[in-house]
From Swiss-Prot:
Coiled coil: none
GO molecular function terms listed in the Swiss-Prot or TrEMBL record: phosphoglycerate mutase activity
Official protein name in the record: 2,3-bisphosphoglycerate-dependent phosphoglycerate mutase
CDD domains reported in the protein's UniProt record: HP_PGM_like
Catalytic-site annotation from UniProt: 10, 88
Encoding gene (name): gpmA
Record-annotated site: Transition state stabilizer: 158
Source species of the chain: Rhizobium meliloti (strain 1021)
Catalytic activity: (2R)-2-phosphoglycerate = (2R)-3-phosphoglycerate
Length: 211
């Protein structure tokens, strides 16, 4: 067994609350989002983990979540690397639109395909495959080597940038990834084998309400 990789999706953002497609736009956390991030941090504190390094995106909602988790585990000053590679999927022309308005305009089915399919990009934006094509190389070069050297690594990022990672880690098919939604602020704790495959996965919270 080598190190530990913890993935956590940012807490509820202002645009999650307003039901807007967000992508690379940069809203902050809501009060609930702050509480969710703190709760995820408390779950990790109770789990007893101490991190060696943290990674997050260049977007404020993930950075704030990362800091709130680190505060909760008593590691407020831990080195944190911010990289655009971990950003949310770029929602292209949908960014800033209301998700219900988009359903009314393009239909429930089409919007679901844009939101959850593997390889159909929203207009002007990234498919999950496109997102994975930048998340996965960054994971391989910057994150995985640290985990394999035995470090405990926190990654605070986004619903779809993390779905693209989880798809590979959990060996999900294109059909299975369609159904996977990650809850805000719920940490997933992966222990990896020396060959980088997953030895164990624990979810510290409830993923069932995610949509
Ligand atoms: O970018 C967004 O709108 C959200 O962070 C994730 O949206 P989704 O649930 O539609 O993928």
């Amino acid at each position: 067994m080598s190190g530990t990789l913890v993935l956590v999706r940012h807490g509820q953002s202002d645009w999650n609350l307003k039901n807007l497609f967000t992508g690379w736009r940069d809203p902050d956390l809501t009060e609930l989002g702050i509480e969710e991030a703190k709760a995820g941090g408390k779950a990790l504190a109770d789990y007893g983990i101490k991190f060696d390094i943290a990674f997050t995106s260049v977007l404020i909602r993930a950075q704030r979540t990362c800091q709130l988790v680190l505060d909760a585990v008593g590691q407020s000053s831990l080195e944190t690397i911010r990289d655009q590679a971990l950003n949310e999927r770029d929602y292209g022309d949908l960014s800033g639109l209301n998700k219900d308005d988009a359903r009314a305009k393009w239909g429930e089915e089409q919007v679901h395909i844009w939101r959850r399919s593997y390889d159909v990009p929203p207009p002007g934006g990234e498919s999950l495959r496109d997102t994975g094509a930048r998340v996965w190389p960054y994971y391989l070069t910057d994150i995985l080597p640290r985990v394999l050297s035995g470090e405990k690594v926190l990654v605070a990022a986004h619903g779809n940038s993390l779905r693209s990672l989880v798809m590979v880690l959990d060996k999900l098919t294109k059909e299975q990834i369609l159904k996977l939604n990650l809850a805000t602020g719920v940490p997933m704790v992966y222990k990896l084998n020396a060959d980088s495959t997953v030895a164990s996965k624990e979810v510290l919270g409830d993923m069932s309400g995610a949509h």
